Every structure is written in structure tokens, then in C-alpha cells.
């Protein structure tokens, strides 16, 4: 029998936790487009939204710009992160959430 603690220990979901606002829907769409074949889960907690995938989740500036319909600076996403799950690697073209090791 699996306990909630066991499930949490073996949870390899990674991704952004974004403050509620104008970026939420474009980031969800971007996660789905930039991570084909991955199941993207979304938990809306009113004040913030948790967007996650198993093991790795990538968000690209190009796709975010397409979804927003305007130029986008990746630092704008970083400012709106309440938190994140996993490790993070960011540059001017993409943000990658990942785990080096899985449980």
C-alpha cells in the first residue's frame, strides 16, 4: 500500500509555479507546445498556478512570444515565478525545469 509520503518522495514532476495573472494561459499553452508527447498537469490555486511535467519541462521565448502576440523577455517570466519544482536552467531563449536524477 502506498502512502501519501511515498507518493511525494517518488514525484518527479518539475515546472513553474506562477502567480495568477496574464502570463498563466500563455505559459500553459507554451508548455503544451514546447513539450510534445508529455502530459502537462495544471493546478489552479487561485493566487498561483502550478504547471508540471514528469522529469523535464521546457518553455521557449519564441513560443511564449507567439502565444502572447508580442515580444517577450524571459526575465519577465522569472519575475512572475512564485516558486518552481525541480532544478532550473535559464537563458535568454528558454527556461528548462528538470531533475538530473529521478527517484
Curated annotation (Swiss-Prot):
The keyword Cell membrane does not apply. GO terms for molecular function: monooxygenase activity. GO terms for biological process: toluene catabolic process. Keywords: Aromatic hydrocarbons catabolism. Pfam families: MmoB_DmpM (PF02406). The alkene monooxygenase multicomponent enzyme system is composed of an electron transfer component and a monooxygenase component interacting with the effector protein TmoD. The electron transfer component is composed of a ferredoxin reductase (TmoF) and a ferredoxin (TmoC), and the monooxygenase component is formed by a heterohexamer (dimer of heterotrimers) of two alpha subunits (TmoA), two beta subunits (TmoE) and two gamma subunits (TmoB). This is Toluene-4-monooxygenase system, effector component. It comes from Ectopseudomonas mendocina. The gene is tmoD.
Amino acid at each position: 500500500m502506498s502512502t501519501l509520503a511515498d507518493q511525494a518522495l517518488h514525484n518527479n514532476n518539475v515546472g513553474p509555479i506562477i502567480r495568477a495573472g496574464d502570463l498563466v494561459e500563455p505559459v500553459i499553452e507554451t508548455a503544451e507546445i514546447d513539450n510534445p508527447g508529455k502530459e502537462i498537469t495544471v493546478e489552479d490555486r487561485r493566487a498561483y498556478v502550478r504547471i508540471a511535467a514528469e522529469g523535464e519541462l521546457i518553455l521557449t521565448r519564441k513560443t511564449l512570444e507567439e502565444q502572447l502576440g508580442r515580444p517577450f523577455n524571459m526575465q519577465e517570466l522569472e519575475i512572475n515565478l512564485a516558486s518552481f519544482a525541480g532544478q532550473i536552467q535559464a537563458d535568454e531563449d528558454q527556461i528548462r525545469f528538470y531533475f538530473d536524477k529521478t527517484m
